[in-house]
């Protein structure tokens, strides 16, 4: 019940407030023209520059997106080129390493060959030296034996052997 009282008092208040409202046509036309004028001014001074600014901003953003896509594509292309150069460099490095190994083996083989030749020469020289030393040793031994034989013959014969023919004969006997 109290609810009905409040509701009717609210209705009465609304009717009082809006009941006296009537349309004032000159004021309505003036307000309408003012609204059109304000909308036109806002459109010309705010909306169109704002729209133009947003369009420019959109173009700027789109250009940046396009440029970043182009830059990304260029970066990918450069990355591919760099990867290809790295692969090529690796292959080239492997070829250089293989060539170095072959050169090393060639140098080692040449060194071994030269060393073997030098060793053969040294051995040959040593053999010649040994043969020469042995011949000198044999000659010295023969000389000592001849001298000893002459001394023994002197003692046996009891006289000195001065005759060159006798000395030659003794030497020939010892040599054979």
From Swiss-Prot:
Top-level division of the source organism's lineage: Bacteria
Chief location category: membrane
Any one cellular-component term (Gene Ontology): plasma membrane
Pfam family, one: ATP-synt_B
Keywords: ATP synthesis, Cell membrane, CF(0), Hydrogen ion transport, Ion transport, Membrane, Transmembrane, Transmembrane helix, Transport
Membrane topology according to the record: Single-pass membrane protein
Transmembrane segments: 27-47
Locations listed in the record: Cell membrane
Single Gene Ontology MF annotation: proton-transporting ATP synthase activity, rotational mechanism
Homology family: Belongs to the ATPase B chain family.
Quaternary context: F-type ATPases have 2 components, F(1) - the catalytic core - and F(0) - the membrane proton channel. F(1) has five subunits: alpha(3), beta(3), gamma(1), delta(1), epsilon(1). F(0) has three main subunits: a(1), b(2) and c(10-14). The alpha and beta chains form an alternating ring which encloses part of the gamma chain. F(1) is attached to F(0) by a central stalk formed by the gamma and epsilon chains, while a peripheral stalk is formed by the delta and b chains.
Summary of the function given for this chain in its UniProt record: F(1)F(0) ATP synthase produces ATP from ADP in the presence of a proton or sodium gradient. F-type ATPases consist of two structural domains, F(1) containing the extramembraneous catalytic core and F(0) containing the membrane proton channel, linked together by a central stalk and a peripheral stalk. During catalysis, ATP synthesis in the catalytic domain of F(1) is coupled via a rotary mechanism of the central stalk subunits to proton translocation. Component of the F(0) channel, it forms part of the peripheral stalk, linking F(1) to F(0).
Name by which UniProt lists this protein: ATP synthase subunit b
Originating species: Metamycoplasma arthritidis (strain 158L3-1)
The gene coding this protein: atpF
